[in-house]
Amino acid sequence: MQLNSTEISELIKQRIAQFNVVSEAHNEGTIVSVSDGIIRVHGLADVMQGEMIALPGNRYAIALNLERDSVGAVVMGPYADLAEGMTVKCTGRILEVPVGRGLLGRVVNTLGAPIDGKGAIDNDGFSPIEVIAPGVIDRQSVDQPVQTGYKSVDAMIPIGRGQRELIIGDRQTGKTAMAIDAIINQRDSGIKCVYVAIGQKASTIANVVRKLEEHNALANTIVVVATASESAALQYLAPYAGCAMGEYFRDRGEDALIVYDDLSKQAVAYRQVSLLLRRPPGREAFPGDVFYLHSRLLERASRVSADYVERFTNGEVKGKTGSLTALPIIETQAGDVSAFVPTNVISITDGQIFLETNLFNSGIRPAVNPGISVSRVGGAAQTKIIKKLSGGIRTALAQYRELAAFSQFASDLDEATRKQLSHGQKVTELLKQKQYAPMSVAQQGLVLFAAERGFLNDVELAKIGSFEAALLAYADRDHAELMADINQSGNYNGEIEEKLKGLLETFKATQSW
């Protein structure tokens, strides 16, 4: 068989057309040093700040220091088997974590991988952990409440949806307990929760997860864990990962609550990473950008407008605002709120709940100091009934503290002063609350009404607790309709006032406590 020149040229053209050249250009570099979870890489020309660098063994590092002749990167995970001379590659991606409803009820690590043994997670996609916070135009003012279930917080330091409220205090003052109770109280409110545990013992986190499960709140919660045994890099990135998971709900017109427990440990982890990267230390050896570390995280907690949600969802969700409420926790040393990290976070947040060791040890729990605790925006979001009835509580406590200090030196007190002291003691006793026992709006309203209208005047101080328990049991049993109505509307008017007054008068006349 003979082929002429035309057929030969056609065959060659066909072969050339069918030939598939698959070429991938990798930007590669070489590890020149490994120490304490930090690698220095030579030869990465086009690496971005915060870019993921692929390491041998399906691991990643994040490029944090871009220097003239090398790149400083922090390894995400074990680094003992990394050695000089190993080849690494740029990925062209920044760190992303899985997001979506499939994460609810699950315990994940900083990278979004499940660590609860319940199998793979069905996520709705991935989101970068570092996102620019919504701008001023995209935000809406805070006017809906987040009920924590604590009388002292909801009455005196109310929290709104989209607010950042700091919980600050020494170790063992009930900071985590308050945050966990706030999460438990959201199980029927429709607010999705994210709990970020940073630098804690694995046993402590397991206990928290068990408590959430016992109180039917885990199904509504994502738990993000970076234990004390994990690398400093994973501890410092955990809050950003949790925030990205919470933003998924905010950007789709839903409400979410995120707890960072705690940002002091995150700042320490970031300080460790920065010092290992040889960045210049500043006050308390923290790097110069530790304020920015927390501000860019907490600014992402916001209430976004319906226009923002509609634009984000391409018109799928209309007329709904979304919110992400943050409860960051800071641990102080011997009550020193003027240290570097506490003052930073106080200045970033919209108020703080200050928990005191002395109050905690004297049996006042939650150990809230109403004098220096404040909510800067929550008042606009407070439920009507609680707003109306809680006005006198803060005043009564302030007068009581002043008089209590004065009465130590005075031998004889007039009748009016004695009454004020007695009322202050009873209000203080009334604001005590057990852990894992959040109260509904109606229950809080009833108790505050009793204090405000003088129904406690003839109740002995030692019997305040039993009086409250009996009153709530009676109201839930015999006046369930009224309680349900208050819970539903949160309103307070003349009719409700008369009903509450009648309820209390009947209770005191017919019941014992």
Swiss-Prot record:
Taxonomic superkingdom: Bacteria
Site label Required for activity, positions: S373
Entries under Gene3D superfamilies matching the protein: 2.40.30.20, ATP synthase alpha/beta chain, C-terminal domain, P-loop containing nucleotide triphosphate hydrolases
Disulfide bond entries: none
Keywords noted in UniProt: ATP synthesis, ATP-binding, Cell inner membrane, Cell membrane, CF(1), Hydrogen ion transport, Ion transport, Membrane, Nucleotide-binding, Translocase, Transport
InterPro entries membership: ATP_synth_asu-like_sf (IPR023366), ATP_synth_asu_C (IPR000793), ATP_synth_asu_C_sf (IPR038376), ATP_synth_F1_a_nt-bd_dom (IPR033732), ATP_synth_F1_asu (IPR005294), ATPase_a/bsu_AS (IPR020003), ATPase_F1/V1/A1_a/bsu_N (IPR004100), ATPase_F1/V1/A1_a/bsu_N_sf (IPR036121)
Example of a GO MF term: ADP binding
Topology of this chain in the membrane: Peripheral membrane protein
Compartments in which it is found: Cell inner membrane
Pfam families registered for this protein in UniProt: ATP-synt_ab, ATP-synt_ab_C, ATP-synt_ab_N
Binding of ATP, residues: G169, D170, R171, Q172, T173, G174, K175, T176
GO cellular component: plasma membrane; proton-transporting ATP synthase complex
PROSITE patterns: ATPASE_ALPHA_BETA (PS00152)
Subunit structure: F-type ATPases have 2 components, CF(1) - the catalytic core - and CF(0) - the membrane proton channel. CF(1) has five subunits: alpha(3), beta(3), gamma(1), delta(1), epsilon(1). CF(0) has three main subunits: a(1), b(2) and c(9-12). The alpha and beta chains form an alternating ring which encloses part of the gamma chain. CF(1) is attached to CF(0) by a central stalk formed by the gamma and epsilon chains, while a peripheral stalk is formed by the delta and b chains.
NCBIfam families documented for this protein: atpA, PRK13343.1
Protein family per UniProt: Belongs to the ATPase alpha/beta chains family.
Function: Produces ATP from ADP in the presence of a proton gradient across the membrane. The alpha chain is a regulatory subunit.
Stated name of the protein: ATP synthase subunit alpha
Organism: Erwinia tasmaniensis (strain DSM 17950 / CFBP 7177 / CIP 109463 / NCPPB 4357 / Et1/99)
Lineage per the UniProt record: Bacteria, Pseudomonadati, Pseudomonadota, Gammaproteobacteria, Enterobacterales
